[in-house]
Swiss-Prot record:
<dbReference type="InterPro" id="IPR036286">
    <property type="entry name" value="LexA/Signal_pep-like_sf"/>
</dbReference>
<keyword id="KW-0378">Hydrolase</keyword>
<protein>
    <recommendedName>
        <fullName>Signal peptidase I</fullName>
        <ecNumber>3.4.21.89</ecNumber>
    </recommendedName>
</protein>
<dbReference type="InterPro" id="IPR019766">
    <property type="entry name" value="Sign_pep_all-beta_subdom"/>
</dbReference>
<dbReference type="InterPro" id="IPR000223">
    <property type="entry name" value="Pept_S26A_signal_pept_1"/>
</dbReference>
<keyword id="KW-0472">Membrane</keyword>
<feature type="topological domain" description="Extracellular">
    <location>
        <begin position="79"/>
        <end position="310"/>
    </location>
</feature>
<comment type="similarity">
    <text>Belongs to the peptidase S26 family.</text>
</comment>
<dbReference type="InterPro" id="IPR019758">
    <property type="entry name" value="Pept_S26A_signal_pept_1_CS"/>
</dbReference>
<dbReference type="GO" id="GO:0005886">
    <property type="term" value="C:plasma membrane"/>
</dbReference>
<dbReference type="Pfam" id="PF10502">
    <property type="entry name" value="Peptidase_S26"/>
</dbReference>
<dbReference type="GO" id="GO:0004252">
    <property type="term" value="F:serine-type endopeptidase activity"/>
</dbReference>
<feature type="transmembrane region" description="Helical">
    <location>
        <begin position="5"/>
        <end position="25"/>
    </location>
</feature>
<feature type="transmembrane region" description="Helical">
    <location>
        <begin position="58"/>
        <end position="78"/>
    </location>
</feature>
<dbReference type="InterPro" id="IPR019757">
    <property type="entry name" value="Pept_S26A_signal_pept_1_Lys-AS"/>
</dbReference>
<feature type="active site">
    <location>
        <position position="137"/>
    </location>
</feature>
<keyword id="KW-1133">Transmembrane helix</keyword>
Length: 310
């Protein structure tokens, strides 16, 4: 949807821009004086000029919107639960497009470099296997990092600078259990199994309460969801050549991303790394949250969801 809108804005800007130039030329006194009086008074000329002026008037607005969406910021809506508890379905987010650089809107190549992505950044990006689909996840692995994800404890181990097989110390990662509250969500186990992403050790009932933890990678802390009884189907993991399943070394100019809702997220564990070229921008702000139930119209706006994302 976002790609179609960008194409529409570009096409509309080009068309209205052309009409804007034509209107300026036709309105020039020197050219206007050379047009015969009988032509200027004809209905066809009058209506044609009106049409040109009307469409040309949209050009300044369209070009401003196009520039803002392409180079400055762009709104997105969160459709799924993969980034809970940080981002919820119904959140409308603002993405800073120039966080890492100003890009060519056609080739997506960086024109002006600004900064490199940081560990912990929440980013919107084009899916590595389908550029028509936009995803939102959190960067946990930088180029050169060796990532290990334990399917039993749901904990990360990150060792930096592994591209040249250098031996370095693991990055400090700490986990702190957060007491359950009304925000913690229940999921139907049957639905999770049908997604072919998870299997269960055992279950005595139909509902499983996810647990909230604080994950702190060095100085960056955020909350995540997972349940130890829910075991990932490791055979579905992306298998990197020469690495054990569940272990990856992030190549140059690529990133390893995870959803904060670890048991309900298709991310780099399943389809691999995100090329730097695919990054659209960094999520910086929630500007609206609609209150709605699945299959129903929104019933209101939740104002306490509005604000910066850290």
């Amino acid at each position: 949807m976002s790609n179609y809108l960008s194409s529409f804005l570009l096409a509309s800007s080009l068309i209205t821009g052309t009409l804007w130039i034509i209107n300026k030329i036709l309105s020039h006194n020197l050219l206007d004086s050379k047009i015969p009086f009988n032509i200027k008074k004809s209905k066809i000329y009058y209506k044609s000029k009106q049409v040109v002026q009307t469409f040309a008037s949209f050009f300044p607005i369209l070009i401003i919107v196009f520039i803002i969406r392409t180079f400055i910021c762009e709104p997105f809506q969160i459709p799924s639960e993969s980034m809970m508890p940080t981002l919820l379905p119904g959140d409308f987010i603002l993405v800073k497009k120039f966080s890492y650089g100003i890009k060519n809107p056609f080739s997506n190549n960086v024109i002006v470099f600004i900064n490199t992505p940081k560990r912990g950044d929440i980013v919107v990006f084009k899916h590595p296997n389908n550029n028509a689909i936009n995803y939102v996840k959190r960067i946990v692995g930088l180029p050169g990092d060796k990532i290990n994800y334990n399917i039993l404890t749901k904990r990360l181990t990150i060792t930096p600078n592994n591209i040249n097989e250098q031996h370095t110390k693991n990055i400090s990662i700490n986990y702190k259990y957060i007491k359950p509250n009304d925000f913690t969500k229940h999921f139907k186990l049957n639905n999770i199994i049908l997604n072919n992403v998870h299997s269960l050790e055992s279950s005595n009932n139909n509902l499983l309460q996810l647990e909230m933890y604080q994950e702190k990678i060095e100085k960056i802390a955020y909350n995540i969801f997972f349940k130890k009884k829910l075991i990932d189907q490791k055979d579905l993991y992306f298998k990197q050549f020469s690495q054990k399943q569940g272990t990856w070394i992030v190549p140059k100019h690529k990133y390893f991303v995870l959803g904060d809702n670890r048991d309900n997220s298709l991310d780099s564990r399943y389809w691999g790394f995100v090329p730097e070229k695919n990054l659209i921008g960094k999520v910086v702000f929630i500007w609206m949250h609609l209150i709605k139930k699945e299959g129903q119209w929104p019933t209101g706006i939740q104002f306490d969801r509005i604000g910066n994302i850290y």
